[in-house]
Amino acid sequence: MANRNNYYPRTLRLQSWEVQKVEEVAYVSDKNRELLDKLAKAFWPGALTVILKRKEHIPSIMVSGGDTIGVRIPNLDLAIKIIELAGGILATTSANISGEATPKSYDELSEAIKSKVNILIDSGECKLGEASTIIDLTSDVPKILRKGAILIEEIEKIIGRVG
């Protein structure tokens, strides 16, 4: 959120795993489609963010001027309902200042975050309490950009070796 590291693009949260929905916002090559399908079946909804090449109609401000976008399906019924009401796709950012710990509850949110948003919904304590794992599928070799709630070993069991 505040003081965001521009290396990471914004994340688009999706209502459900559908290749067509992902392809509305990102390019998915044939090879990446197979990997994405395996990852989605294993880890979505859940704490896995997949980086793909964004389509041109996604405004550059949403991706910090870059050409990639993060895609994720959250594992929270309330979030899924909000995404559904927003048309099935919702641009989001994290609820922490870049580099700081991920809050597990409303009470752990920093005052800097609370002062910058118009609405906060307290949905209880986060079951994971850890950031999502981020995997980049924009090149021939999948690459882990951030270790998170899903272990690299779990990902490698599904799609093989990652960088």
PLM region spans:
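Active-site-adjacent structural elements in enzyme catalytic cores
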Residues: 1-163
